[in-house]
């Protein structure tokens, strides 16, 4: 994990790709975020989070370059249960993802250009949808792709069907 993270930033530096790595205070620890600023007149700000086993850095390859070329600022973020938060601080996922997003937005007040887009990949789609349902003022628009609507349904695809009734009855 640490090697992949270190090599990612070495790669950005070697390619002279500007970025700002920022620690955002949250509860009794901090969340890593990564800010990329477009060189164009900004059309808005994209807030992107990944899913269950996502690393903050892997989100660069799915969205950042294209978004910057299209004129958007990009803020990648992780929350409890992801990346460093789980590996270093042993912080599990929270059902209150709206509080995670609020902390990120608060920390980036000066950099945000509206409209604000919340983008969630995989389980991140569920997290962004949940945050937006709990606080409709977080984002102007929400984009969910490779959406992961239900952890249990996903789990069930990997176990024999004979065991499915036990999952429904919660043993």
Regions found by a protein language model. Name each.
Residues 40-43, 48-55:
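Active-site glycine-rich loops that stabilize anionic/oxyanionic intermediates
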Residues 67-85:
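Conserved alpha/beta-hydrolase
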Residues 90-112, 116, 123, 127:
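Alpha/beta-hydrolase active-site loop
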Residues 134-171:
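Hydrolase active-site cap/lid region
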């Amino acid at each position: 994990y640490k090697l992949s993270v270190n090599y990612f930033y070495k790669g950005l530096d070697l390619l002279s790709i500007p970025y700002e790595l920022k620690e955002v205070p949250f509860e009794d620890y901090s969340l890593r975020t990564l800010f990329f600023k477009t060189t164009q007149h900004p059309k808005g700000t994209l807030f992107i989070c990944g899913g269950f086993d996502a690393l903050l850095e892997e989100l660069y390859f799915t969205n950042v370059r294209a978004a910057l070329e299209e004129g958007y600022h990009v803020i990648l973020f992780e929350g409890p249960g992801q990346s460093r938060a789980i590996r270093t601080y042993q912080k599990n996922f929270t059902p209150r993802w709206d509080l995670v997003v609020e902390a990120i937005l608060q920390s980036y007040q000066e950099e945000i250009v509206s409209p604000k887009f919340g983008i969630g990949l995989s389980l991140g789609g569920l997290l962004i949808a949940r945050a937006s349902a709990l606080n409709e003022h977080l984002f102007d628009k929400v984009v969910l792709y490779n959406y992961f609507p239900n952890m249990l349904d996903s789990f069930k695809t990997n176990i024999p069907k004979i065991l499915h009734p036990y999952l429904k009855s919660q043993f």
